[in-house]
Amino acid sequence: MKKKIAEYEVGEQVDIFLLIKTATKGIASNGKPFLTVILQDPSGDIEAKLWDVSPEVEKQYVAETIVKVAGDILNYKGRIQLRVKQIRVANENEVTDISDFVEKAPVKKEDMVEKITQYIFEMRNPNIQRLTRHLLNKHQNEFLDYPAATKNHHEFVSGLAYHVVSMLDLAKAISNLYPSLDKDLLYAGVILHDLGKVIELSGPISTTYTLEGNLLGHISIMVNEIGKAADELQIDAEEVLILQHIVLSHHGKAEWGSPKPPLVKEAEILHYIDNLDAKMNMMDRALGRTKPGEYTERVFALDNRSFYKPTFHN
């Protein structure tokens, strides 16, 4: 079986089909144009540079294009890159299905739906339960397919749902340890906090930001969605405002994207749960590509640190 891109080590030669996830134009110090492309397969992605590109080449190598690439793997300033020696667009008779090249959540969609539904079923506050069920049903198809982000954490097909399922299990464990927490509020906050990303982001493959995403962002989008759902369900109660606050504050600080800091206990805990799950996902994926006794490539979203994998960890 042919190796996947994440399985190659520094110095190894590569000759493989990959999908262009993103392609970004830049200008080199010599004034010539180049492309920074992120190439992916189900195991993950890797950055590559295409130097001295013509306008015709730019039009060829765009997002969602399958390419055949030959080159080698190198470590450039702590980042793993693919140095391209040859590249061409794949022929239709070679590969055609883009879905064969995308990373997916390690849990089946139907299993995630079942688990999330069970958490909603356990809610005892009827207003919170109705609002949560209504909004999840409204956006369920996209919720199950979309990534949680364009980069950094859970940036794969079904990553949003996988992030939520992991956070729900964390929320349950923390609620059992601290019974003063309102489980209904916390579970609803987990399910709804990033649901606006199904409007903020373009889709599960070659994900970019929509116009609404660029101008409003998923936090504002979801606060509005909760308000609309409350009107449709004729719920006029404080739970609506508290849920809106939990979503609004889940990034923790204004400089991190939240207009208000958490001012409700469950909002504070949601912020920590969200942060913990995102960071664990980033570390696990980086360490999963690393041999025992070696350091990961630098993880930009974690202060550009490289993490060491102990020799006794297989």
Curated annotation (Swiss-Prot):
One Pfam family name is: tRNA_anti-codon
What is a biological process (GO) this protein takes part in?
Answer: rRNA 3'-end processing
Q: What's the domain of life for this entry?
A: Bacteria
Which keywords does UniProt give here? Exonuclease, Hydrolase, Nuclease
Is Cytoplasm one of the keywords UniProt gives this record?
no
**Domain HD: start-end pairs:** 163-279
- E.C. number: 3.1.-.-
Gene Ontology terms, MF aspect:
3'-5'-RNA exonuclease activity; nucleic acid binding
Q: Which InterPro entries match?
A: 3'-5'_exoribonuclease_YhaM (IPR020873), HD/PDEase_dom (IPR003607), HD_domain (IPR006674), NA-bd_OB-fold (IPR012340), NA-bd_OB_tRNA (IPR004365), YhaM_exoribonuc/phosphodiest (IPR050798)
Give the EC class as a word: hydrolase
* Stored HAMAP family: 3_5_Exoribonuc_YhaM
Report the family membership: Belongs to the YhaM family.
This chain's function reads: Shows a 3'-5' exoribonuclease activity.
Name it. 3'-5' exoribonuclease YhaM
Organism lineage: Bacteria, Bacillati, Bacillota, Bacilli, Bacillales
